[in-house]
Amino acid sequence: MQIAKTMGATVTGVCSTAKMEMVRSLGADHVVDYTKDDVTTNGETYDVILDAGAYRSTFDYTRSLAPTGVYVLVGGEMKRTWQMLLLGRLRSKKGGKQYTMFVARANRPDLAKLAELMDQGTLRPVIGARYPLAHAAEAVSIMEQGKAVGKVVITVSE
């Protein structure tokens, strides 16, 4: 979201009620509470959908994509990853809509740009909680339940 904003995008964040304020603080122009509104049926269309949760079928978002829109799966459940791998390319051949996956490949220029954005204060990490290694199971449980607001960090030593 923060990177999209630096590129001039109008950003709509989709999150639960508990995370709305954080999403706004990261620069979202619009915030949709998925517990009250379904972005797949609300009539809005988007040029790009970045799906970091992958809690529902990839293709549920078809009607939310603009005619030449791009759906990008960024992590999530293995079931959705397989769905994208097997059907994304085939589905992309129909019409102008594209379905793809994002796989990060660290490279020096991109990392330098991220460091520059952090130095400028344009990009900031959101750390919601820190857990010592001895409490890693609790940290994972919080993430699995979707209760984490920001990143959960496991500290190995102080």
Positions of PLM-derived features:
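Terminal peptide-recognition signature
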Residues: 4, 23, 49, 61, ...
